[in-house]
Design a protein with these regions (language model features):
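Short, conserved active-site entrance elements at the starts or edges of catalytic domains
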Residues: 104
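Active-site- and interface-proximal helix/loop "cap" or "latch" segments in soluble metabolic
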Residues: 2-101, 109-203
Length: 203
């Protein structure tokens, strides 16, 4: 059973929980940057993060629960992993969920554009199966963030994003109709939003 935490401005955590004979047999914890790139704990410059992942995994198996102590020096990561494991255990419980999606903010990533070699990362906030907030950034091939004031569609990128956001709040999650003059942005945004929705699924 796999689930994700709420996304912060800097990262998002995921958990894969293995259940055997009704018990937690194993837990794999991962963490991703705000560019939706998985952190390699063997090279990541904050060693507490990798240590926290290993320690919390073992503690959760021992406790048969997500109810473990926050790892000192990795509070944000620990909180996210605990939430992700709690959500995975909800999926494993067999109880029919009330909603299709968990309430929260989820980080999605689009495909890479064949036109410019960039991809889009979006933060999608859900409540009662509706998108209630949305923000995005474009990650360039050199892994810098596109300045949103740059004109890309004959109008500033930020304006196109706002048009998409307005449509996203009003439409079925993940299915915004093509915005005139910003076809590529619409398709890429929908792809990234659906990726975030996949992370938010309650079963």
């Amino acid at each position: 059973y796999e689930a994700w935490s709420d996304a912060s401005d800097k990262s998002i955590q995921s958990a894969k929980v293995f259940i055997e004979n009704g018990k937690i047999a194993g837990v794999i914890l991962r963490e991703y940057t705000d560019k939706h790139v998985e952190k390699d704990f063997s090279t990541y410059p904050w060693p507490q993060a990798g240590e926290a992942a290993r320690t919390l995994s073992a503690q959760m198996v021992a406790a048969q629960s997500a109810d473990v102590d926050i790892f000192t020096g990795a509070t944000g990561s620990s909180t996210g992993w605990i939430q992700a494991v709690e959500r995975a255990l909800e999926k494993a419980s067999g109880t029919e969920p009330t909603n299709k999606y968990f309430d929260g903010t989820f980080l999605g990533r689009s495909e890479t554009s064949s036109y410019g070699g960039y991809y889009k990362v979006v933060w999608v906030t859900l409540k009662n199966d509706k998108v209630v907030d949305y923000k995005a950034q474009r990650v360039l091939p050199d892994h810098t963030i596109q300045d949103p004031s740059v004109e890309v569609y004959g109008w500033p990128l930020e304006m196109a994003r706002n048009s998409y956001k307005e449509a996203a709040l009003a439409s079925e999650p993940g299915y915004v109709d093509v915005i005139t003059g910003a076809t590529g942005l619409t398709h890429q945004s929908n792809h990234a939003v659906r990726d975030a929705l996949d992370q938010a699924l309650t079963k």
